Amino acid sequence: VYIKISEGVGTPDEKAKANALAAKENGLQIGYYHFGRPDKKNDNTIELDATAEAAEVKILLTDLPVADLPLMLDLEDTASFDSSLAPKEYLTWVETFLSFFFDPVNPSTNPLIYGRKEYLERKLPPTHTLGTRYKLWLSRYTDDQNKAVPAKGWNKWHIWQFSEKGVLGTNGNLDLNLKRVTD
């Protein structure tokens, strides 16, 4: 189970700790995700903005139950936010943020990148190499696995989110995902 811990800077998810404890109490593995807001709003530079978001995530993680799964960086647009950064700037932001969590010695703990193929291909330069260091969590709502094509820069998805209409012991919808058993 992945639990949202924050979005941008200054917006921690107040339910993250309770959600994590409840999931652990029910025997579930947990991981956390940060909804990235790649822009220049913090100190007016890409690097300082990404650093501010990463630093806040690191602080938030110290007060939460230990994760069983790697951190995930959620990259998507919403009705209220879509990054205006050019592709090279967007890549710089993503690489700066992820550098705070990258472990070359233990790559299985490196963060995942979550996003839709179309969004990632629009925001990132086509020649980026993020897929060599970070696994892709692909959001593609279809029940046809052949249509779950990874974004440029990745040769396969690690996790595929195929629906947002799952309901299992909750009051609302849950996202449904498949994880590759082997990479």
What does each of the following model-derived ranges do?
Residues N106-R122, K135, I159:
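Aromatic-lined carbohydrate-recognition surfaces of secreted/lumenal glycan-active proteins
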Residues Y2-D103, S108:
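Substrate-binding cleft of extracellular glycoside hydrolase catalytic domains
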Residues K41-D49, Y119-L130:
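Glycine-rich, charge-decorated loop segments at or immediately adjacent to ligand/cofactor-binding or catalytic sites
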Residues V1-I3, G31, R133-S139:
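Short hydrophobic/aromatic-enriched beta-strand-loop microsegments
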Residues H34, G115, R140:
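Short beta-strand/turn micro-motifs composed of small residues
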Residues I3, L73-L75, I113, L138, ...:
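Conserved beta-strand positions
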Residues T127-D183:
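Functionally critical loop-and-helix segments that line ligand-binding/catalytic clefts
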Residues S83-A86, R122-T127, N171:
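A short secondary-structure junction signal
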